[in-house]
Regions:
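Short amphipathic alpha-helical molecular recognition features
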Residues: 14-18, 50-54, 109, 139-143, ...
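Surface-exposed patches in mature extracellular/periplasmic domains of secreted proteins
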Residues: 41-43, 104-105, 163-170
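Eukaryotic short linear interaction motifs
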Residues: 14-17, 38, 46-47, 84-86, ...
Length: 241
C-alpha cells in the first residue's frame, strides 16, 4: 500500500482547541487506516522564517518536511486544520493514479482551486511546492489574495508555459488583473481568467497534474449544505468549534 502523510500546519498563535472536532476526526481516521498524521507548528523550520505571510510559510514547511523527514516517493495530503473526516470508509489512495504526482480540486462556488493538495514527495512535487512558497517574494503590490491568489497564477504558468513568455495575450491579461486587484471580486476575476487560459481540462498527464472537478475532490465546504453531508462526502472544510 502507499505511504501517506496527512499534514496540518498550525500558524503561531492558533490553538488546537479551535479545531478540536476536525482534528479528532483526523486522528481517528489516520489511526484506522495507518496513515501518518502530522500536526505541526509553522515555526518549526528556521528556513521558513523568511516568510512573513503565514499562508506561504505553511508551504515552505511542507517543502522542508519533504526534504528532511518524509520518505522519497511517499504521498502528502496537506489540509487546513478545520478539515474533518465525515466518511472514514473513503481512502486517500483512491484519489491517486499512476501518471499524476500533483492533485488539486475545484471549489464549488467560483473558479477557485482550493489551497489544499495531495502530491508525491519526489523532485517534481518538491519543485512545485517550493515555487508556490517562493511566490510570496514576487507578489504584486495589490489585493493579491495571498497564497490562494498566487496558486492560480502558478498553475497557469505550470500548465500553460506560453503564459510565462508573453506569447499569450490572455495570460498577460490575467497577470494585469492580479497586479491591479483591489478586492476579492478582482481576485475572483483573475482566477476565472487563469482558468480560461488553462482550459476546460481536468487531466494534464504531460505535467503530471490532475484537477478534480467540483464535488469530486476529497473535501468540500461545509456551509454549502448547512453542515449536512452525505455518504458521497469524504471530508468537510470549515469545521470550527
Amino acid at each position: 500500500s502507499l505511504e501517506v502523510t496527512i499534514l496540518i500546519v498550525l500558524s503561531e498563535g492558533s490553538s488546537k482547541e479551535d479545531y478540536r472536532s476536525a482534528l479528532n476526526s483526523m486522528e481517528a481516521y489516520s489511526a484506522l487506516h495507518g496513515y501518518r498524521l502530522r500536526i505541526e507548528s509553522d515555526r518549526k523550520y528556521e528556513e521558513c522564517e523568511k516568510h512573513g505571510d503565514k499562508f506561504f510559510r505553511r508551504h515552505c514547511h511542507t517543502y522542508q518536511m519533504m526534504l528532511n523527514e518524509l520518505p522519497e516517493e511517499s504521498w502528502i495530503l496537506f489540509v487546513d486544520a478545520d478539515v474533518g473526516v465525515v466518511n472514514p470508509n473513503k481512502l486517500i489512495e483512491d484519489f491517486i493514479e499512476e501518471e499524476y504526482d500533483i492533485y488539486l480540486y475545484n471549489r464549488f462556488y467560483n473558479w477557485e482551486f482550493a489551497a489544499q493538495y495531495l502530491f508525491k514527495n519526489n523532485e517534481r512535487g518538491r519543485d512545485w511546492i517550493k515555487k508556490w512558497a517562493d511566490m510570496e517574494f514576487s507578489l504584486p503590490n495589490s489585493f493579491h489574495g495571498t497564497d490562494n491568489g498566487a496558486l492560480h497564477i502558478l498553475m497557469m504558468h505550470y500548465l500553460v508555459p506560453t503564459s510565462i513568455t508573453g506569447e499569450s495575450s490572455i495570460g498577460e491579461m490575467c497577470q494585469i488583473i492580479w497586479e491591479q486587484s483591489k478586492n476579492y471580486d478582482d481576485v475572483f476575476t483573475m482566477q476565472a481568467c487563469t482558468r480560461m487560459m488553462i482550459g476546460e481540462r481536468d487531466d494534464f498527464p504531460e505535467h503530471h497534474v490532475k484537477i478534480f472537478p467540483k464535488g469530486k475532490g476529497w473535501a468540500r465546504d461545509a456551509w454549502l449544505l448547512n453542515s449536512r453531508w452525505s455518504m458521497d462526502d469524504f471530508m468537510l472544510h470549515s469545521i470550527k468549534e
